[in-house]
Each structure stands twice: as C-alpha cells, then as structure tokens.
C-alpha cells in the first residue's frame, strides 16, 4: 500500500511466470510502483508508476544500451540507469533486517566466514559497507564477512583504475576483525546464465541471440593487469565456455 517506494518482487523468470514487461505490469498495477527483480538478479522490469516514482525518463537511457524503454527492461550494466535512483535499498531498517536474517542463517549453519563477491553492485559502496559493518559488528554471531570490490561498480561510477586502487586501500585500512577487505578484486566477464546472457562458443543459443560482455576484453585486461601487479587475488564471474576461454587467455598474459 506504500506508494512512496516500489513493490519489489524477486525471482521472476519467464520460463515459469510467462512474459511480463512494462505494458503488462502497468495493466496489472496502474497506480502501484512495481519492480520485478529477475531470478538471475541481473535484470529489472518496471511499470509506468515505478518509472514515474524514480523520475526516470527515456533521455536518461542515453549511453545505457542494455535497456529497453518501451519494455521497462533494464539488464546487466543497463541496471545502473536505475540503481542510483533507488536509495530506499539502503534504508537502515530494511537493509538491516535483511542483514540480520543473513547473519542468523550464517550462525545456524555454523559458518564462520562469508564472502560478499560483489560489494558495490548497488552503486553506493560506502553506504553498503557501513550498513554491513553496523549489523555484523553488533551481532553476537561468531562470524566475519570478507568484502570483495567489483569492477563494474567502479566503471559505472566512472572511476579510473588508480582511483579504484586508492579507494580499496582506504577500505582495507578501515577493516575490522568482523568486516574486512583484503587483496581481492572481482572481474565480470559475461552475463547471467539464468538470463540467457552468458557467452557461448559454437553452436551458441539455438534461437541465434548472443550473450553480453559485461566489460570489454580490452578494459578487463587493463584492470586485471593493474590489480594483479598490485598483488591482488583475482576472482571472475564467468558462465559460458566462450567467456571461460577469454578468462583463461587473459590469465595467461598476467
């Protein structure tokens, strides 16, 4: 009933739920802002009311090719056209409750170390880190969280490699025994497999569509080399055999 924030449902997938885009969502919910967060977590589908609430216009999508205004569809890096306009994600009460649930599950499972392999995916890493730190360090669960910065966060915020290294060094200096950064950095090679956006070699997808490169090979190479030279352990998001081949070839050059 609260129309000041969107109603967000996670888990949508057309194989199970049918095709739903902006037109269908607007017809179902003409007044309530609604966002479907795809099962892959790499796609957002929104209705008219959500676009109006977030004050997103078609002009805002210039420079964001992985978007479809007519369909209200934002996927992979195209999601960064929406994410900065969604500060409610970091509402302390809402985010804190989610983190508390996570810490409780970690405790119940006997897990003592958990890694976040995409710190900054919501476009505001400092807010994210502060909320994680507040929840974890105020918890009695004997667990620690290791946070891993991700290439797409820095690129979406137009940071240089040098600025990224400086920022991560600052975060590392602020580490505690419960929430810490160490020398880890994550690359993003191809898109989500649940979204059919992974990169495959022949014969590829049977309908002929192609996957998505999250970051160009040339840019990925530069960032990987810089962080490798700085003594970082590299992690990579890769799904299809085409992207795995690119990653292996990249590692051979380091």
Regions found by a protein language model. Give the residues of each.
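Short, conserved active-site loop motifs that form the nucleotide-linked donor/cofactor pocket
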Residues: 178-180
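Accessory "access/gating" subregions that flank catalytic or transport cores
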Residues: 171-176
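Divalent metal-binding segments
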Residues: 1-166, 183, 187-243
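Conserved helix-loop functional segments at active or binding sites
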Residues: 226, 249-253
């Amino acid at each position: 009933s609260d129309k000041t924030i969107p109603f967000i449902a996670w888990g949508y997938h057309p194989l199970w739920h049918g095709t739903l885009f902006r037109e269908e969502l607007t017809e179902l919910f003409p007044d309530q802002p609604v966002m479907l967060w795809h099962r892959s977590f790499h796609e957002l589908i929104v209705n008219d009311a959500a676009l109006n609430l977030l004050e997103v216009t078609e002009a805002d999508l210039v420079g964001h090719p992985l978007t479809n205004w007519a369909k209200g569809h934002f996927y992979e890096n195209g999601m960064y056209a929406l994410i900065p306009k969604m500060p409610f994600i970091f509402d302390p009460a809402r985010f804190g409750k989610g983190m508390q649930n996570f810490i409780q599950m970690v405790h119940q499972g006997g897990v003592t170390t958990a890694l976040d392999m995409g710190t900054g995916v919501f476009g505001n890493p400092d807010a994210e880190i502060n909320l994680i730190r507040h929840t974890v360090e105020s918890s009695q669960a004997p667990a620690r969280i290791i946070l891993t910065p991700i290439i797409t966060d820095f690129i979406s915020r137009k940071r240089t490699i040098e600025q990224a290294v400086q920022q991560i060094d600052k975060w590392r200096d602020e580490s505690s025994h419960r929430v810490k950064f160490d020398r880890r950095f994550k690359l993003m090679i191809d898109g989500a497999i649940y979204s059919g956006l992974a990169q495959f070699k022949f014969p590829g997808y049977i309908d002929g569509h192609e996957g998505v490169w999250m970051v160009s090979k040339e840019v990925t190479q530069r960032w990987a080399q810089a962080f490798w030279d700085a003594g970082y352990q590299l992690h990579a998001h890769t799904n299809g055999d085409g992207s795995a081949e690119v990653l292996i070839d990249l590692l051979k050059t380091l």
